[in-house]
Swiss-Prot record:
GO CC annotation: plasma membrane
Main location: membrane
InterPro entries per UniProt: Membr_insert_effic_factor_YidD
Compartments, as annotated in UniProt: Cell membrane
Name the record gives this protein: Putative membrane protein insertion efficiency factor
Topological type in the membrane: Peripheral membrane protein
């Protein structure tokens, strides 16, 4: 690998490292700070678990975006409830691989590129 391909791989590797660091900090919060406070999260999974899942599944950029969007829902203006991370496009319960993920083009309003 040379040139842009190599630098792209290095950037992805650095992103994974930073995402792992954020997950470590969230886990520290969950095990050191959160037990000292009363349970107030109105969502399932909790916001911290959601952030860990999003960073693990989608990586640094999109995972951070999803976690930040979830935190904006925190407050009395949102009723809470079940709110898991979104599925990857094209993957369903019985999905064995992602080879068919881009077979069908998304229609207007179905693109997952912004969130």
């Amino acid at each position: 690998m040379t040139g842009p391909a190599r630098s792209g791989a290095a950037i992805r590797g650095a992103g994974r490292t930073v995402a792992r660091g954020l997950i470590f900090l969230i886990q520290l919060y969950r095990h050191m700070v959160s037990p000292l406070r009363p349970a107030t999260c109105r969502f399932v999974p909790t916001c911290s678990q959601y952030a860990v899942d999003a960073l693990d599944e989608y990586g640094l950029i999109r995972g951070s975006w999803l976690a930040a969007a979830r935190l904006t829902k925190c407050g009395p203006w949102h009723q809470g409830g079940w709110d898991p991370i979104p599925e990857r496009p094209g993957c369903r319960v019985n999905c064995q691989d992602a080879s068919d993920a881009w077979a069908v083009r998304a229609t207007r309003g179905e693109s997952g590129s912004l969130v």
